[in-house]
């Protein structure tokens, strides 16, 4: 079991509140109230940096695409290698969800195609 360095009741409450959000629109509403634009952009940037590091992109490619400094890229890389595996957990789930979404779209398209090609009797 991972021991969390930041564990405290206020953070527990915050994370429980986040878990209550049901969709992206609700996330926008909550995070726009609780974070500054700069804080949100920084978190989004770090997630993209982690994604690109996992894809073995170079620091130069990452900096150019995201605008992240090499210090930020290094911090994210350190977390990927030695952190609590939070980035890995989320990126794997995002990848799985994206794959599941693609499968769902393909199934829907295939179903629509097969229904559209049936002869009417």
Task: Enumerate the language-model features and the residues they cover.
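Short alpha-helical "recognition helix" segments of helix-turn-helix
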Residues: 61-66, 73
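Short, solvent-exposed alpha-helical "recognition" segments
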Residues: 78-93
């Amino acid at each position: 079991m991972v021991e969390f360095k930041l564990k405290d009741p206020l953070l527990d409450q915050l994370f429980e509140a986040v878990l209550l959000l049901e969709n992206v629109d609700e996330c926008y509403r909550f995070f726009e109230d609780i974070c500054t634009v700069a804080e949100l952009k920084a978190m989004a940037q770090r997630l993209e940096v982690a994604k690109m590091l996992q894809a073995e992109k170079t620091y130069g490619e990452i900096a150019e695409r995201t605008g992240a400094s090499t210090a930020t890229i290094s911090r994210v890389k350190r977390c990927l290698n030695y952190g609590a595996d939070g980035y890995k957990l989320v990126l794997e789930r995002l990848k799985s969800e994206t794959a599941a979404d693609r499968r769902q779209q393909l199934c829907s398209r295939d179903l629509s195609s097969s229904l559209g090609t049936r002869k009417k009797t």
